[in-house]
């Protein structure tokens, strides 16, 4: 299940990153303005690409934190307390 969550986070992070990069691109200069419909009634929001950029960076930061936490949890069971040559003491209740 952790692998599927990791894959999902990577896909979401990459798609957000791609969307933010594509949102900043200028339209092609070769396009004929007469072929485009008149969208003068629409008001583009200038803050929308900034929102996507923040969202993408948050997703990437969360993915990196998740990976680092899972790596640290996976290696913590290998740490030994005391001398490795000693037998572990048995705990009785």
Curated annotation (Swiss-Prot):
Pfam families: DUF4576 (PF15144). One of its GO terms (cellular component) is extracellular region. Keywords: Secreted, Signal. Residues 1-23 form the signal peptide. Its main location: secreted. Residues 22-47 are annotated as: Disordered. InterPro entries: DUF4576. It is found in: Secreted. This is Uncharacterized protein C5orf46 homolog. It comes from Mus musculus (Mouse). The gene is Gm94.
